[in-house]
């Protein structure tokens, strides 16, 4: 297995953060990101960038973090107990975009690198990441295009890659207490290292670079779609699912909180406004009901 180079990974991640922020500012056309650099007492730090009150994006956050610690936290060793007690280094770019218009989907993306050290032993390392889409209104064209973009970036790495990571995404972003997916999925991968450092890093780069290519056309297509208070209230209600998932199930959120990460940056994924409604039921025959019946479950979007 080729030797991992964390300096190379960090340089890519910092550049990716810049490129995504520039792309989102161009899409929004009105607001700019504010940057907040921070340091962590135990080692490392990061830079959080948040855009608020834009013409298109109500809130968008794009975080870079690079943290170190003397021992792996429980969230990272739950499925790899042999790593308990190792020192670690973790770096990544994580972003969540909450658009203003309910016809534009919310989206999340993340690419990350972990390396764990122990004296007298080879380092243990892996890449993880992915991206997923959470529409509020059912536009089949958007979902198919999103998954086609995901499949296209996977193809150079093997025919089996897209179906594998698409399924993993469906399984990961599942809310058991709601019996529904968080959205329409995309890609999710973790523990990637068997192909060696260069190939694993290349795939992580493809996912990071492919995110905006997949999302920008959907934003452009829906940004001028008219909406009223009814659609806005439904969007705020559905945002509640985002909060439920991130605070109850998301491994990244738990990892950040357990490692003494920066709370403001970790909770940047939360929507700026959200509402809950007791025993909500969508009106039969409406687009909201179609979202529930046709979109909030795993589907093969490229073979309908």
From Swiss-Prot:
InterPro entries, per the entry: Coprogen_oxidase_aer, Coprogen_oxidase_aer_sf, Coprogen_oxidase_CS
Quaternary organization: Homodimer.
Swiss-Prot/TrEMBL GO biological process terms: protoporphyrinogen IX biosynthetic process
Binding site for a divalent metal cation: 98, 108, 147, 177
Disulfide bond positions: none
Needed co-factor(s): a divalent metal cation
Name of the gene: hemF
Pathway noted in the entry: Porphyrin-containing compound metabolism; protoporphyrin-IX biosynthesis; protoporphyrinogen-IX from coproporphyrinogen-III (O2 route): step 1/1
Region of interest called Important for dimerization, as start-end residue ranges on this chain: 242-277
Protein name as catalogued: Oxygen-dependent coproporphyrinogen-III oxidase
Keyword line: Cytoplasm, Heme biosynthesis, Metal-binding, Oxidoreductase, Porphyrin biosynthesis
GO MF: coproporphyrinogen oxidase activity; metal ion binding; protein homodimerization activity
Residue numbers annotated as active site: 108 (proton donor)
Catalytic reaction annotation: coproporphyrinogen III + O2 + 2 H(+) = protoporphyrinogen IX + 2 CO2 + 2 H2O
Pfam families given in the database record: Coprogen_oxidas (PF01218)
């Amino acid at each position: 297995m080729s030797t991992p180079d964390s300096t190379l990974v960090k340089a890519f991640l910092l550049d990716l953060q810049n490129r995504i922020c520039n792309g989102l500012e161009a899409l929004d056309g009105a607001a700019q990101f504010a940057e907040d650099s921070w340091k962590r007492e135990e080692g490392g730090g990061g830079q959080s960038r948040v855009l608020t009150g834009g013409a298109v994006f109500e809130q968008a956050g794009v975080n870079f973090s690079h943290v170190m610690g003397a021992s792996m936290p429980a969230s990272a060793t739950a499925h790899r107990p042999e790593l308990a007690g190792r020192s670690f280094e973790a770096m990544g770019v994580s972003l969540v975009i909450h658009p203003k218009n309910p016809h534009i989907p919310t989206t999340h993306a993340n690419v990350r690198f972990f390396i764990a050290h122990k004296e007298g032993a080879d380092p243990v390392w892996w890449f993880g990441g992915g991206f997923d889409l959470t529409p509020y209104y059912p536009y089949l064209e958007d979902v198919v295009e999103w998954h086609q973009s995901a499949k296209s970036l996977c193809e150079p790495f093997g025919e089996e890659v897209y179906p594998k990571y698409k399924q993993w995404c469906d399984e990961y972003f599942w809310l058991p207490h709601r019996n529904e997916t968080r959205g329409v999925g995309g890609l999710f991968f973790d523990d990637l290292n068997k192909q060696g450092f260069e190939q694993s890093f290349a795939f992580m780069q493809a996912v990071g670079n492919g995110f905006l290519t997949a999302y920008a056309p959907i934003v452009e297509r829906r940004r001028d779609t008219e909406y009223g208070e009814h659609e806005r209230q439904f969007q705020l209600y559905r945002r509640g699912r985002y909060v439920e998932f991130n605070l109850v199930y998301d491994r990244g959120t738990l990892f950040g909180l357990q490692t003494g990460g920066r709370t403001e940056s970790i909770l940047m994924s939360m929507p700026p406004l959200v509402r809950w409604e007791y025993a909500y039921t969508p009106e039969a025959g409406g687009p909201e009901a179609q979202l529930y019946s046709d979109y909030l479950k795993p589907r093969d979007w490229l073979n309908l």
